[in-house]
Amino acid sequence: MKRYREKGIGQKRLSCIIGINEREGNPMKVVAFNGSPNKEGNTYCALKMVADELEKEGIETEIIHVGNHVIRGCMACGQCGKNKDEKCVFGDDGVNGWVQKMKEADGILLGSPVHYSAIGGTMKSFLDRTFYVASKNGGLFRHKVGASVVAVRRSGGIPTFNQLNNYI
């Protein structure tokens, strides 16, 4: 830590460098979401590579596989905004639990394979619902660090990457 201070790096920046959550003094946490239907396919491998690097810096990571779940799309019914309970009214899948994990994390990492120059349908449904709930409940994910990872074979990587980045 001393060498960072000698270089004139402030405490806030120092906390980011060494992976310390400045609010609580706890290790930073990143939650990663694998939007691939294949649990340990190329998207998982890319997320795992990022997670391994984060863990080397003392940042806890968890990879959650959402790509093989049946997740209904957002209907923009607005009930999550009316209820103000940080939950989607469709509670029959894992989305509400994942919203809370994203809220508690310091960073969010999204990963998807390329499906016809876009993210897969399950990932789209998941992201639409989680970010709609977040926006209707006071911006639950505001001020969080976000990043995206795309697994691509030939083409369509840039539109898919842009689509993920539009959420974060």
Q: Where does each model-flagged region fall?
A:
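Cofactor-binding loop segments of dinucleotide-utilizing enzymes, especially the Rossmann-like FAD-
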Residues: 33-35, 66, 150-153
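Helix-loop-strand module that forms the ligand-binding subsite of alpha/beta enzymes
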Residues: 89-168
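Cysteine-cluster motifs in flexible loop/terminal segments that predominantly coordinate metals
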Residues: 69-102
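N-terminal beta1-alpha1 ligand-phosphate binding loop
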Residues: 29-57
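A short beta-strand-loop structural module common to alpha/beta enzyme folds
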Residues: 59-69
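Short, Lys/Arg-enriched N-terminal segments with co-localized hydrophobic residues
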Residues: 11-27
